[in-house]
Amino acid sequence: MTKSAELFAKAQDKIPGGVNSPVRAFAGVGGSPIFVERADGPLIFDADGKAYIDYVGSWGPMILGHNHAAIREAVISAAQRGLSFGAPTETEITMAELVSELVPSMEQVRMVSSGTEATMSAIRLARGYTGRDKIMKFEGCYHGHADSLLVKAGSGALTLGQPSSPGVPADFAKYTLTATFNDLDSVRELFTANKGEIACIIVEPVAGNMNCIPPVEGFHEGLRQICDEEGALLIFDEVMTGFRVAENCAQGYYNIKPDLTTLGKVIGGGMPVGAFGGRKDVMQYIAPTGPVYQAGTLSGNPVAMAAGFACLKVLTEEGNEKRLADTTKHLANGFKELANKHGIPMVVNQVGGMFGFFFTDQETVTSYADVAKCDIERFKRFFHLMLKKGVYLAPSAFEASFTSLAHGPKEIEATLEAADQCFAIIASETK
């Protein structure tokens, strides 16, 4: 038994399921998860000392690579001045100014401690600002574990939301409407059936929680137009895409201006940070200037702000975002070419520094319904074959994977060499 397996067995005695976030348990791929002892650059090292090329990156935050000197030094310096004050600091101002500079639609910014806090607060603000109760999300899009967002589609576009987790009252979930990602008709139908009742649309501009699904041409433009016509706010949940698909986030990449934006992951540089922001007239509705309440003991934590600021300053140095995107594109194209070589049908999607692949004979994958048709068992097999060869991909067919600036030609070529061998094994098993 490996040390990771021993630790997993031990963890299950005191930690529910042995993990502090469900996907880490490898439930989506089977087997026992690796326990990480340390990480550096593009590599993580498990409890047995084995190194893996890491394409999870702590689920997105580690965009510079692990243990980056600039972030490490910023954290140490800030920690030496105190870990938390519960009072305003100048660092909060410089961080907010940098975020607004990079993301112009965020005229004002409120810092929080997680992506879930950010989306939860943005939705409360949208409801308070518009005076409407209902919200719209998309099937397969995840916006954190707030009750109103743990809702699935039901039996059709016009069906009221049903909870997708026990503990969420059905009466509460009925205020969440679910449309089909990349389908503007489903959005229009919901607005027609709920005229004047919908406060906002919240959407991942690139859906990263049903693997990696980019928008089809005109989808976000259509959402912007519909929200303008209906008096609803458009919220871009950029917790995953923020600063990862482009320097000015997915909204800059696709040239769309949302009313509110939520951020997380990259903005903290590995520390627990989230943020939401947007139009000044909307943000003025948040306490203490407005009636919509939101607060947090550790919001704007000085150590976390220092880490996030250092991360964004390095990331936005000239050429870095292009290098990240080029590296990811090379990897994604390599996966596709190797799958074709071995006669394995596959769709590979990539935007900026995120990518995903689907074992499917479909031409494209653009919605949750498409994802559900993919070969999950083949993904599980591929994941474990790659893991044995020292490549750590997202342990779920429904999660995107990520590169970092620390991933260089050496790591990409090693990954593709491993993939070539793994595809060959899978092809031989299906003949």
Curated annotation (Swiss-Prot):
PROSITE patterns: AA_TRANSFER_CLASS_3 (PS00600). The modification N6-(pyridoxal phosphate)lysine is found at residue 265. GO terms for biological process: protoporphyrinogen IX biosynthetic process. Its EC number is 5.4.3.8. The keyword Transferase does not apply. Its cofactor is pyridoxal 5'-phosphate. GO terms for cellular component: cytoplasm. GO terms for molecular function: glutamate-1-semialdehyde 2,1-aminomutase activity; pyridoxal phosphate binding; transaminase activity. Its main location: cytoplasm. Keywords: Cytoplasm, Isomerase, Porphyrin biosynthesis, Pyridoxal phosphate. It comes from the Bacteria. The keyword Methyltransferase does not apply. It catalyses: (S)-4-amino-5-oxopentanoate = 5-aminolevulinate. Pfam families: Aminotran_3. Pathway: Porphyrin-containing compound metabolism; protoporphyrin-IX biosynthesis; 5-aminolevulinate from L-glutamyl-tRNA(Glu): step 2/2. It is found in: Cytoplasm. Homodimer. Belongs to the class-III pyridoxal-phosphate-dependent aminotransferase family. HemL subfamily. This is Glutamate-1-semialdehyde 2,1-aminomutase. The gene is hemL.
